[in-house]
Structure formats: C-alpha cells, structure tokens
Amino acid sequence: MLALGKLLELTLAGREPAEKTQLTVEGVRMRWMGEGALEVRPPQVRDNGTDLLLSAGIHGNETAPIELLDELIRSIARGDLKPRARILFLFGNPDAMRRGTRFVEQDVNRLFNGRHEQSGGAEALRACELEHLAASFFSLPDRYRLHYDLHTAIRGSKIEQFALYPWKEGRQHSRLELARLRAAGMSAVLLQNKPSIVFSAYTYDQLGAEAFTLELGKARPFGQNQQVNLAPLRLRLEQIIEGREPELDENLEELQLFSVAREVIKRTDAFTFNLADAVENFSPLEKGYVLAEDAGGSRWVVEEDGARIIFPNPKVKNGLRAGILIVPTDAGSLG
C-alpha cells in the first residue's frame, strides 16, 4: 500500500511523508496538502465532476468517523476503491486527536466564518488553515460540491444518527440531499434557520457546497467503536466516490425533520441547566418547563409544542451556545 494511504498514522505521529505525491495502480493521484490533509484526484478521463470534502477529527476524541476516513483512504491507496470524484480528506484537529481530547484550548468548530479572526492560539490558526484548504479545493468552476463533516456526540441520543443542514439567506434546502442523507443512514435532519460558525456552515455559506454536519453516535476512544454502525454511510460514500450511486428516492416519509426554535446561550458562570447530566439528545421537553437559568433572574422556559433539546453543554464558554431547542417540521419548504 502507498505510504500516503497511512495518513492517519502520519497525522497521529506528527510526521510528514517522504513523498508528497503518489500514484495508485489505477492512476489516481494522492497528494499530501499539509498536516491531516490529503487530496485525491482521479485520472482526467474518469473524473465525473464531483468534488467531495470529507472531514473528521474537528473534535479530537470523536474517533469513529476518523477511523472511517482512514479505511476509505487505505482502500483508495490499495486500489480497491476507484475514485471518479475529486476528494479532500481532512483530519481537523491533529493536536487534540493525539491527546484524545475534544480540543486543546478552544473548540475548533466554533471558529469558522470569521470567528478565528477574533481569537488567537493554535486552534484558531487551524480553523483558518482548514478554511483555506476547503476554499482552494472548491475553487474549480462548474463542479458539484459536497461536504460531510463527520462527528460523534458527547452524550447519547434518542436518535443516534442525524444531520445538521446549514442555512443561507435566499438558498433552499435540497430534497435530493435529504434523500441522500436518508440513504446514508441518517434518521433525522435539523434544518437550521440562521448563520452558524461551524465548519459545514462555512463551506455551505461561503463556498457554495452542499454541506452537512453528521452526528454518528457517541464518542469513544480509538478501537472501541464496534457499536457504531457506519455501514450505510460507508456504502453511500463509496458509491459517491466511485460515481455509482443508485437513483435516490425523494420520498422523505421515513426521515424526521426538525427546525431550530431557539438557541440557549450561556451568559455568565452562574448558568445552570435543569436537566440530568446524562440527558440524551432529542429528549422531549414539556411546555412550561424551566430549562435553564442564569444570573440576574434570567430563565429559559419551554414555550414550544413538541420541543426537544440537543447538544446541552453547560460547560461551554460564556457567550456560546449551551444547547438548542428544536421542534418538528415538514418538507413543505424544500427545494
């Protein structure tokens, strides 16, 4: 197998490859673009016009998606997987991956769409670097741009695998893309309705890609992801990579759709959630329930019918989102 097929090993060891560019037996060019970054380019005669960005490890302890990308890269390097798409593989936060932690100083996935310019430190620089890598990759005109940013969650979830679909003024969410997510094993999609500072929001908003954050189960250490079923996602990614994706059924009846009702923002150190520490994502909330409290008598009271909570995290820094209140929605507004 080609040495560049061992991108994960190189990244975890903090080493550069001796050869920055290698060709597979199929004539596929693999090019090391920097730490944790590998571009894969098929021969021109096989290129089908798709640019696929696959990122994982934005949070260093979310290992199941990192292992999935490692398997795909190795399959390409061996010649088992024969790309017709251009692909950029990114391991988002190598320092945190090496430490087995979510981040070192700052959450990289809160530093996109201009936020890194307001901050400092190694992780702000990494967010800037990831933006530049993505912008360069998606710079070719007249191509189909797709980005999946793969994650696992801090906590358990009543819906184990789900996606977050970014928002941009004047742009509709795509029914076809939702059908693709359903085929890839996602059971629910959160349709966002305001700008965001995560990686997929940057590529969606600034680079014109169809972009998604995929949550694939609970975060576990390397080698302990046997309970995370990524087979449907892996199959769909292999089909996209090889240009053999079956026709998609745009019937979305089996896909649960949600929209954002409100974001819960932590203002001060006095912030508290009135939730059990082990509360799961998508847990239902009764109308009138006092969800959270902060200094000065500030309270978050559930006003919405059918409300649920996702990503509750009272440990975030002041000024950041500590959770999201979501409500069911339908496919009526889709493009």
UniProtKB/Swiss-Prot annotation:
GO terms for biological process: arginine catabolic process to glutamate; arginine catabolic process to succinate. Its cofactor is Zn(2+). Pathway: Amino-acid degradation; L-arginine degradation via AST pathway; L-glutamate and succinate from L-arginine: step 5/5. The keyword Zinc applies. The active site is at 215. Zn(2+) binds at residues 59, 62, 151. InterPro entries: AspA/AstE_fam, AstE_AspA_cat, Aste_AspA_hybrid_dom, SuccinylGlu_desuccinylase. It catalyses: N-succinyl-L-glutamate + H2O = L-glutamate + succinate. GO terms for molecular function: hydrolase activity, acting on ester bonds; succinylglutamate desuccinylase activity; zinc ion binding. It comes from the Bacteria. Keywords: Arginine metabolism, Hydrolase, Metal-binding, Zinc. Coiled coil: none annotated. It holds the Pfam family AstE_AspA_cat. Its EC number is 3.5.1.96. Binds 1 zinc ion per subunit. Transforms N(2)-succinylglutamate into succinate and glutamate. NCBIfam families: arg_catab_astE, PRK05324.1. Belongs to the AspA/AstE family. Succinylglutamate desuccinylase subfamily. HAMAP family: Arg_catab_AstE (MF_00767). This is Succinylglutamate desuccinylase. The lineage of its organism: Bacteria, Pseudomonadati, Pseudomonadota, Gammaproteobacteria, Pseudomonadales.
